[in-house]
UniProtKB/Swiss-Prot annotation:
Modification N6-(pyridoxal phosphate)lysine occurs at: K265
Gene name in the database record: hemL
Major place of residence: cytoplasm
Record's catalysed reaction(s): (S)-4-amino-5-oxopentanoate = 5-aminolevulinate
PROSITE patterns linked: AA_TRANSFER_CLASS_3 (PS00600)
Keyword hit for Isomerase: yes
GO biological process entries: protoporphyrinogen IX biosynthetic process
GO terms for MF: glutamate-1-semialdehyde 2,1-aminomutase activity; pyridoxal phosphate binding; transaminase activity
Name of protein: Glutamate-1-semialdehyde 2,1-aminomutase
GO cellular component terms attached to this protein's record: cytoplasm
InterPro entries: 4pyrrol_synth_GluAld_NH2Trfase (IPR004639), Aminotrans_3 (IPR005814), Aminotrans_3_PPA_site (IPR049704), PyrdxlP-dep_Trfase (IPR015424), PyrdxlP-dep_Trfase_major (IPR015421), PyrdxlP-dep_Trfase_small (IPR015422)
Organism: Salmonella enteritidis PT4 (strain P125109)
Quaternary structure (record): Homodimer.
Length: 426
């Protein structure tokens, strides 16, 4: 047995499923998950000593590549001053100033410890600010594991949501309406059914948890218009897209102004950080200045703030996002070319430093139904053959891939060459 197999066997006796987040268990592709020893730049190194070109990037944060010296040094320096104080620090102020400067729609920002905390808190704030209970989310979008978000669509577009996890009370789920991503008709129907009850829409501007689905041109502006028409708030969940699709996020890339924004992943530079913020009048409703409660023992942790501050300063340097886009475009085009040579039907969506690979005969993939019609079994074979080639993709047909500026042209070319060999075997 490999060392990864031995560790996985031991882990399953001690940790549910052997992992601390379900997708890591390889249940979406089968087999034994890799246990990682270290990472540097664009590469992961497993406990058995094998190197992989990494397109998971810790599920998004590693936009600069692994073990970036500026972030590593910032963490070391902060740790030498203390690990946690439970009191305000100068770095929290500097971090808030940096974030609000980089994302102009955020007049104020509150730091938390995860993307789930950010979305959960933003929704509570929207409900408190509007005095309404219902929310709209989209089928196939993921916003963390808060109870109100673990909800699937009912039997029709206007039926109340149903829990999609045991432990979520139906009374919670009934306030969540699930619409179809990239379909404004379904959203308008929900508002017309409940015109005075919907507090907010929460949306991934690029859906990254049904692989990678960019918005149609009219979708995000249409959501903004519907929120304005019916008095609801628009929450854009940029946990995945923030500082990746563009410096000011996908909201800037697509030209839409939210009321609240949720951030995570890149904002922590690899440390556990989330944030939410937006309009000053809305944020003023948050405790201690307002009645909507939110708190966190480790929120604004000095080491996490130091890591995030260092990361964002690097990400804000000229040329970063142009490089990300060029590398991702080169990879997407190369994969499509290699697939065509092998007569493999393939769609590759990409925007900024995100991409998604779909085995499908369709010309495009734009919504959850399109994703579910793709060939998941072929993806599973593709994943494992690429892993044998030393390329680590997301171990699920429903997760986006991530590029970093640490990836080289050689890494991209090697990945395309590996895919060419794999396509020949499919």
């Amino acid at each position: 047995m490999s060392k990864s197999e031995n560790l996985y066997s031991a882990a399953r006796e001690l940790i549910p499923g052997g992992v601390n987040s379900p997708v890591r268990a390889f249940t979406g592709v089968g087999g034994t998950p890799l246990f990682i020893e270290k990472a540097d730049g664009a590469y992961l190194y497993d406990v058995d000593g094998k190197a992989y070109i990494d397109y998971v990037g810790s599920w998004g944060p590693m936009v600069l590549g692994h073990n970036h010296p500026a972030i590593r040094n910032a963490v070391i320096e902060a740790a030498e001053r203390g690990l946690s104080f439970g009191a305000p620090t100068e770095m929290e102020v500097k971090m808030a100033e940096l974030v609000t400067n980089l994302v102009p729609t955020m007049d104020m920002v509150r730091m938390v410890n995860s993307g789930t905390e950010a979305t959960m808190s933003a929704i509570r704030l929207a409900r408190g600010f509007t005095g309404r209970d219902k929310i709209i989310k989209f089928e196939g979008c993921y916003h963390g594991h808060a109870d109100c978000l673990l909800v699937k669509a009912g039997s029709g577009a206007l039926t109340l949501g149903q829990p999609n996890s045991p432990g979520v009370p139906a009374d919670f789920a009934k306030h969540t309406l699930t619409c179809t991503y990239n379909d404004l008709t379904s959203v308008r129907a929900a508002f017309e059914q409940y015109p005075q009850e919907i507090a907010c829409i929460i949306v991934e501007p690029v859906a990254g948890n049904m692989n990678c689905i960019p918005p149609l041109p009219e979708f995000l502006p249409g959501l903004r218009a519907l929120c304005d028409e019916f008095g609801a708030l628009l929450i854009i969940d940029e946990v995945m897209t923030g500082f990746r699709v563009a410096l000011a996020g996908a909201q800037d890339y697509y030209g839409v102004v939210p009321d609240l924004t949720c951030l995570g992943k890149i904002i922590g530079g690899g440390m556990p950080v989330g944030a939410f913020g937006g309009r000053r009048d809305v944020m003023d409703a948050l405790a201690p200045t307002g009645p909507v409660y939110q708190a966190g023992t480790l929120s604004g942790n000095p080491i996490a703030m130091a890591a995030g501050f260092a990361c964002l300063n690097e990400v804000a340097q000229p040329g970063i996002h142009e490089t990300l886009d060029e590398l991702t475009t080169r990879l997407a085009e190369g994969l499509l070319e290699a697939a065509e040579e092998a007569n493999i039907p393939l769609v590759v969506n990409h925007v900024g430093g995100m991409f998604g690979i779909f085995f499908t005969d369709a010309e495009s993939v734009t919504c959850y139904q399109d994703v579910m019609a793709c060939d998941v079994e072929r993806f599973k074979r593709f994943f494992h053959l690429m892993l044998e080639e030393g390329v680590y993709l997301a171990p699920s047909a429903f997760e986006a891939g991530f590029m970093s500026v640490a990836h080289s042209e050689e890494d991209i070319n090697n990945t395309i060459d590996a895919a060419r060999r794999v396509f020949a075997k499919l």
